[in-house]
Amino acid sequence: MFTLARVLNNIGSASSNEPIPYCLICSEVADGNHFGVAAACRACAAFFRRTVQHNKIHECGRNGQCFFLSCKFLLVGFQISPLSSDARSMCKACRYGKCLEMGMQRSSVQQRREQLGKRLNISDDRGKPVLNKLRRAYEMLILNRKHVHNRRENQAPRAIGFNELPIVFQNESTSIYQFLWEAFPEYSMLLPDTKLAFFKNFFLSFCLFESSFNGCSAKQKNVMLIPSGDYIDLAHSESFFTNDHQTFTERDNIEILAQRLKLIQSSITVPLSAENVDIYEFLALAGIILLESDSESEADFQEEAVKIKSNIIKDLLFHYQCINIYDDAAMRLGAVLSILPSIQVCCSRSNNFLIINSKDVSESQSPFSRIHGNQKYAQFVRSSQESLRHVLANFIKFICKFVSI
């Protein structure tokens, strides 16, 4: 097939020991073989890759009659050099058609992506060390939960009642604490007061955030998947307040709490679903939530927290480079980070913290006592030893304030 680029390539081959190859698509200087075409430039290769990966459909406004190659050339000695070209800014439909006409293969795009993924995975730990550490810690958290919550193999999830939630979060507190130690070694070096402050800010925020994320991952927008493997049915919130032994009778509070659960759904679940947040993005946001504590107990750690957050952002950008599916990684990063304010609205940074303990749990059995084992934390635990009814009533009041706007 006759093309201007092939003429240029033939002339260059005959006139120089080091010929300059020209792109068969746009006649700019080529840099190698791309997707089956012997000579193509990076710009045309990138254009073809994006079109194929995103299944873009371009339309020509001139019924496929665009004069695609509108280049002017200057003869310099025995070399022909393009002075200007507006080929790349012309009709995308005709440009894509030219790519196919010159031999670019759609199947080569996916094959190249797989090879790229394997190559980048070799240096994955070096490329995103913070996020990989977070993921390993999170995988350990998931494994630990099977034992902590006495989950049987292949046990079907069920909708839980309000009275069951305290035990779930009581057991979960120990697992989350271990997760923090594994994910952030810096956490273990903090003073006890600072550890507690960070844990207060993180625990319930993470539980709500993770429940929403898991609901999105399971394509179930009307449920909150809780750590035990069961769920809260947002579509039938009235069932959340009844069980075999007791019916919760404070109807006004029930309705308020049901509204707040729906607010959590709209403020956290919907944005996560809209952006189709993946596991690394979820862990990055979780890390930032922890590190944006209002605690000022240790100013030195606040400086360290800024560095860790910066490294999380760098890792996330490298993650986008690895998966190679977004045209603009910076735009994707901005879209994901824009979810944070919605999460922070629902997960207030107030000093109020929900302590869930039943009256049957002794101080020595409390997860906080097992974790911290000092007088201040023992006092913290003792203050939470109330009757189950009182705890449940406080839970309603807390949630109403917790997610109020």
From Swiss-Prot:
Name the record gives this protein: Nuclear hormone receptor family member nhr-199
Molecular function as annotated in GO: DNA-binding transcription factor activity; sequence-specific DNA binding; zinc ion binding
Keyword match Heme: no
Protein origin, superkingdom: Eukaryota
PROSITE patterns in UniProt: NR_LBD, NUCLEAR_REC_DBD_2
Protein family membership: Belongs to the nuclear hormone receptor family.
Main localization, broad class: nucleus
One Gene Ontology term, aspect cellular component: nucleus
One protein family per Pfam: Hormone_recep
Function as written in the Swiss-Prot or TrEMBL entry: Orphan nuclear receptor.
GO biological process: regulation of transcription by RNA polymerase II
Zinc finger (NR C4-type): 23-44, 60-94
Naturally occurring in which organism (per UniProt): Caenorhabditis elegans
DNA-binding region(s), chain positions: 20-111
InterPro entries, per database record: NHR-like_dom_sf, Nucl_hrmn_rcpt_lig-bd, Znf_hrmn_rcpt, Znf_NHR/GATA
Keywords: DNA-binding, Metal-binding, Nucleus, Receptor, Transcription, Transcription regulation, Zinc, Zinc-finger
